[in-house]
Amino acid sequence: MLVLSRKANESIKIDSNIEISILEIKKDSVKIAIKAPENIKILRSEIYDIIKEENKKSILQDKNNIHKIKKLFDYFSK
């Protein structure tokens, strides 16, 4: 992991197409701006974690549904 220090109105470039700018620094928060191509997804980590958990639940539900459908198929195939 690369750790950098930046002041307000300074920025960081990632590759040639992503720029992270420090807009404002307050006592307990930092306001940033991110310029990136539209195909790059940018999410707050807490939102990303919620989406990840919901996707896991969905996969488990799909597996459960597939098992139920198989049982129905087996029942009607007799």
Swiss-Prot record:
Q: What is this protein called?
A: Translational regulator CsrA
Query: According to its record, what are the GO cellular component terms?
Result: cytosol
Family label: Belongs to the CsrA/RsmA family.
**Compartment(s):** Cytoplasm
What does this chain do? Answer: A translational regulator that binds mRNA to regulate translation initiation and/or mRNA stability. Usually binds in the 5'-UTR at or near the Shine-Dalgarno sequence preventing ribosome-binding, thus repressing translation. Its main target seems to be the major flagellin gene, while its function is anatagonized by FliW.
What GO biological process terms are annotated to this protein in UniProt? bacterial-type flagellum organization; mRNA catabolic process; negative regulation of translational initiation; regulation of bacterial-type flagellum assembly; regulation of carbohydrate metabolic process
* InterPro entries membership: CsrA (IPR003751), CsrA_sf (IPR036107)
Q: How does it assemble?
A: Homodimer; the beta-strands of each monomer intercalate to form a hydrophobic core, while the alpha-helices form wings that extend away from the core.
Give the organism the record lists.
Borrelia duttonii (strain Ly)
Pfam families, alphabetized: CsrA
Q: Which GO terms describe its molecular function?
A: mRNA 5'-UTR binding
Instruction: Recite the UniProt keywords alphabetically.
Output: Bacterial flagellum biogenesis, Cytoplasm, Repressor, RNA-binding, Translation regulation
